[in-house]
Design a protein with these regions (language model features):
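ATP/NTP phosphate-donor binding region
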Residues: 1-90
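A glycine/threonine-rich phosphate-anchoring loop and its flanking beta-alpha core
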Residues: 10, 111-209
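Short glycine/serine/threonine-rich phosphate/pyrophosphate-binding segments
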Residues: 19-22, 43-46, 73, 98-103, ...
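Short Gly/Thr/Asp-enriched flexible loops that form oxyanion-binding sites at enzyme active sites
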Residues: 50, 79-80, 99-113, 145-148
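N-terminal loops that bind phosphate or other acidic moieties
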Residues: 55-56, 82-85, 106, 123, ...
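Glycine/serine-rich anion-binding loops at beta->alpha junctions
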Residues: 88-104, 137-139
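Active-site segments that bind and position negatively charged phosphate/pyrophosphate groups
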Residues: 201-274
Length: 274
């Protein structure tokens, strides 16, 4: 086992209706935000649940939801231009993996003098970043707690992973109620991906007792959620259990190393843009 070095970042708030605290928490890092949002949230009526807490706290914001089917560099350049011209204090990302990836990359490159393609080709950002607040609407994200961002190179359509500065994401608000709009097939696919993430983290040569502890608990929670029927000892709703399991699996994977299944999933998502 490798040496154990513990540094918890970002702050994580997980539970039903935690999105209502978005406004009061966002004020800690600024009062003017760009909200990058998955367009499906507007169609399902979820978008207002995210923006309402900001309006209540008199936080200035504008929403960008013109996302393509992949977290590509062309969309990233559009986001960077809007963010820089708007003089924002930070970015709030609400959605799945591609939304969070674009927001994280935008925060990392906000003060950089070069385009995103210089970093796609191997450069490393060194300038200061702006704060990122993540509101995931899926149960897992393999790169959320790492200093890496998966992107699609618009020039070639290939998947690339760029390195970012540490400590970009300041807060993760994980609200299971935001995931209720997922279809049964989407939930099943994400559950399978979460299980694959947990398995490869547990078998990783870079695993630690901390990552093993998180993964074992994640698998236990997934088994409770899959059972579906409440018992005298387990009364937590399945959607909350799945969210807790996904969060722990993401943390466990980040504390060791991603493996073949994560990279295969990234490649498939980039290739078929789903």
């Amino acid at each position: 086992m490798t040496d154990f070095i513990l540094k918890i970042s970002p702050n994580i708030i997980l539970g039903p209706y935690t999105v209502t605290r978005l406004g009061q928490n966002a004020l800690e890092w600024g009062s003017r935000y760009m909200v990058i949002m998955d367009p499906i949230l507007k169609e399902t009526g979820t978008a207002e649940k995210i923006t309402a807490p900001l309006a209540e706290r008199k936080i200035e914001y504008f929403v960008f939801d013109e996302l393509t089917q992949a977290a590509d560099t062309q969309t990233l350049e559009t986001i960077l231009n809007l963010a820089r011209n708007s003089h924002i204090h930070g970015i709030i990302a609400a959605g799945g993996g591609k939304t969070l990836a674009l927001a994280k990359a935008a925060c990392a490159l906000f003060n950089e003098p070069h385009t995103s393609y210089d970093y796609i080709d191997g450069g490393a950002p060194t300038a200061g970043t702006i704060p990122l607040i993540c509101v995931p609407t899926t149960i897992r994200d393999a790169f959320l707690f790492t200093d890496r961002v998966p992107l699609c190179d618009s020039r070639s359509g290939s998947a690339k992973i760029i390195k970012t500065q540490n400590g970009i994401c300041k807060l993760v608000l994980w609200d299971p109620n935001l995931e209720l709009t997922l279809t049964d097939k989407q939930s099943a696919a994400m559950g399978l991906e979460t299980f694959s993430m947990a398995l490869e983290a547990y078998l990783s040569r870079k695993s630690t007792f901390f990552s093993d502890m998180l993964i074992e608990k994640a698998l236990q929670l997934m088994s409770y959620a899959a059972d579906g029927s409440p018992t005298l000892t387990v009364t937590t709703p399945p959607e909350v259990l799945y969210t807790q399991a996904g969060c722990m699996a993401s943390l466990g994977l980040a504390s060791c190393s991603a493996g073949a299944s994560t990279l295969l999933s990234l490649t498939i998502n980039t290739r078929y843009k789903r």
